[in-house]
Structure formats: structure tokens, C-alpha cells
Design a protein with these regions (language model features):
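Internal helical hairpin/lid segments
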Residues: 227-316
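Glycine-rich beta-alpha junction loops
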Residues: 34-37, 140-142, 168-172, 193-196, ...
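Phosphate/pyrophosphate-binding betaalpha-module
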Residues: 136, 140-203
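Flexible, glycine/charged-enriched surface loops at secondary-structure junctions
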Residues: 27-30, 162, 239-248, 274-275, ...
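Short catalytic-loop micro-motif centered on adjacent basic/acidic residues
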Residues: 30-32, 113, 134-137, 163-165, ...
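A conserved active-site cap/scaffold subdomain adjacent to cofactor or substrate pockets
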Residues: 163-165, 182-249
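Metallocofactor- and cofactor-centric catalytic cores in central/energy metabolism, strongly enriched
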Residues: 1-130, 144, 148, 152-157, ...
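Structural motif
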Residues: 85, 132-134, 188
């Protein structure tokens, strides 16, 4: 298939692998922070192609997975209110909260609807003016522009019954947290392609400047990933640190200024809460003043104290501290048909990927 086969050429792959082997002379730990990268790395067997000195870590690249139980529990509490409709992306349905899930609540008769776009929430609100519609706004910078546009349109149309439970995350601040970890020892990042189409290279510049580590924005085909790893290996071998773009056919240094303008018209950087990592400054978004009336956290609801499954290692898996096979629940009681933690729910979750491909 044109424009696909070119990025799966075996001869070129062999050349890149040889280049990586020649360049890598010491143990190196690289982390990918995109669930799509994790899936591609496993699907194409890229770990098995690399020299033993290179270890790939899977980081917090799954937006469903990093959403903490506190937000899941809040959404469940909202769903139990009278005349409330919850609108959510499909993956969120099966994510276990402290004692229930949205899927279980729907089975109990709560009005919970799966949508594919935040703009669909506007349609639901228009069709049900007598009810309060709450959209579960999760995702990284990739989905934030469309969420912002939905909010702008709702305000423009003076909708009073549409609200947003904001659990969006910003990627760059969590990278700083990971680099500060003494357990990980990250030598470089395979930076996310989709997120970078929005934010560009500038938000990553602290990585080489403050931590002297390289990062390469990388695509998702086998040759993309191998070339990204080779570019990182060269920087490490040459004792350099900069942010480079491998995925140049899609990503520009400036990102998408129009999309960023929409995001910051509605939101400002704020505290973000991550599963397993707690609160990270500026890793989330807060509503700007004109749009705070749409914040679903203004609802007066009683939420049960949140708790985690005592044996689930999802929080540590998201940080690259543990791998799924180290979890006692993995493949025993935790599997895609019965996920104990969110890392097994989403197709971008590390546990789901290990289960499917390893």
C-alpha cells in the first residue's frame, strides 16, 4: 500500500538496526510516552530487534489509564443524580473505580452514553434541554482542541445544560517528573507523534536544557520507530542532547498554533492528577473565568472516598517502574474480559498490550 509499505521496508529496517547496534556502546534506557508507540513496538517485534544494551520502558502514554480513581468515582456519583446524562468515550466505560464502573452503573439504569467526539455532547444537550449533560473530558493535548471548540460553541449557543468533567492532561510536565525519578534513570525519550502535532517542539526544550537528555518526536510505523531510536542512540553516543523530529511528514516545530490558541482561549495550565503519580503542577488544565460555569466539579455531589485495588500495579506500570508480568494479577484474574485496573482496559494500556502481544 503506497505511503505505508515504504515505512515497513525490511532492507531499510536492517540498515537502521545495524546502525543502532554500532552506535550503542553502553546500557541505555529509552522511554516511549505514547500508547500507540507501545502497541507498534510490540506488534512489530521491535524490542527483539534491538541490541541487549537498549531497554525500552513504557511510560504514561494512555489517557484512560492515567485518569485517577477520584475522577472515575466523581463521574459515577454524577451518573447517580436525577436528570443527569453522562457522555463519555467508550474506553472509560469499563475502567474500574473504587467500587463500581460506568458500565456497571449503566446496567443499573443510569443514563450513560458512548460518544466518539466531544461535539456529540452538544447534540445530546440540545435534544434534552430538561437534563444536565456531563461530558467526561479526558485526553492529552491531541484531544484538547476539540474539547475547547465544543465549550466555545456551547457558550456561543448559550447552552445552560452542558458541563465538562475536566480530566485532561499535559504531557511535558509529567516528563519532568519521570526524569527526576531515581528509580528509572531515563537516557532519552521517544516523544509522542500525535501530541507533538499540536504542541510542536518548544514545550520539550526543558528536557535537554535542564536534564541534558535527548528526545526524538517519532512516528508510528516500524521504520519511524527504528529511526527514532537510532537518532537517540547517536545523540547519546555523541554526548549531545536536543529535541529532534523524526516524524517530519506530520510534525512541525511550531506545532499547530490555531489548535493551541483554541485550547488557551478556554483553559489555562493547572494542576493535574495522575494515577500512581499524584498531583503534578501545570500538568492539567483549569477553566478560564468565562467558562467556569461549565465545570462539572461545581456540582454538589457526595463522592465516596477513593481507593485502589491493593494488588494492582497499574500506577507503577505507568511510570515504567514495573512491567505487567511483575503484577500478581496479570493474566490470572486481570485480563481484557475482567480488567482489574485501567492499564488492562484501554487498547493503548501497557497491560493490555503485553497481554495481546507477549
Amino acid at each position: 500500500m503506497k505511503f505505508i509499505d515504504e515505512f515497513r521496508d525490511k532492507e531499510i529496517a536492517q540498515g537502521l538496526i545495524q546502525g543502532i547496534r554500532k552506535t550503542t556502546t553502553r546500557p541505555v534506557q529509552l522511554m516511549e510516552v505514547c500508547g500507540t508507540h507501545t502497541v507498534s513496538i510490540f506488534r512489530y517485534g521491535i524490542r527483539d530487534m534491538l541490541p541487549e544494551q537498549i531497554r525500552l520502558l513504557s511510560g504514561p502514554g494512555c489517557p484512560v489509564c492515567v485518569t485517577p480513581n477520584t475522577d472515575i468515582d466523581f463521574a459515577i456519583a454524577l451518573s447517580r443524580q436525577e436528570k443527569v446524562i453522562i457522555a463519555t468515550f467508550g474506553d472509560m466505560m469499563r475502567v474500574p473505580g473504587s467500587t463500581s464502573s460506568l458500565q456497571n452503573e449503566k446496567a443499573e439504569g443510569r443514563d450513560i452514553r458512548i460518544i466518539n467526539s466531544s461535539l456529540e455532547a452538544l447534540r445530546i444537550a440540545e435534544e434534552h434541554p430538561e437534563k444536565k449533560v456531563v461530558f467526561l473530558a479526558i485526553g492529552f493535548e491531541t484531544t484538547s482542541p476539540t474539547i475547547a471548540v465544543a465549550i466555545l460553541r456551547a457558550r456561543e449557543e448559550r447552552m445552560k445544560n452542558l458541563f465538562f468533567l475536566n480530566s485532561q492532561k499535559r504531557v511535558p510536565p509529567v516528563l519532568a517528573t519521570l526524569l527526576q525519578s531515581k528509580e528509572l534513570g531515563i537516557d532519552g525519550f521517544i516523544l509522542p507523534g500525535h501530541v507533538s502535532t499540536i504542541i510542536g517542539t518548544r514545550p520539550y526544550q526543558f528536557i535537554p536544557r535542564e536534564f541534558a537528555r535527548p528526545g526524538v518526536i517519532t512516528g508510528f510505523e516500524p521504520l519511524d520507530i527504528l529511526q527514532g531510536i537510532w537518532m537517540l542512540a547517536r545523540q547519546i553516543a555523541e554526548n549531545r542532547a536536543s529535541v529532534e523530529i523524526q516524524y517530519r511528514r506530520v510534525v512541525r516545530e511550531e506545532g499547530n498554533p490555531v489548535a493551541m490558541e483554541k485550547i488557551y482561549e478556554v483553559f489555562k495550565d493547572g494542576e493535574g492528577h495522575w494515577r500512581g503519580m499524584g498531583s503534578i503542577p501545570d500538568s492539567g488544565y483549569g477553566f478560564r473565568e468565562p467558562y467556569r460555569e461549565m465545570d462539572a466539579r461545581n456540582f454538589d455531589v457526595e463522592v465516596e472516598p477513593s481507593k485502589e485495588h491493593p494488588l494492582c500495579l497499574c500506577g507503577e506500570v505507568l511510570q515504567g517502574i514495573r512491567t505487567p508480568p511483575e503484577c500478581r494479577l496479570f493474566k490470572v484474574v486481570c485480563h481484557p474480559e475482567n480488567p482489574v485496573g485501567p492499564c488492562m482496559v484501554s487498547v493503548e494500556g501497557t497491560c493490555h498490550t503485553y497481554y495481546k502481544f507477549q
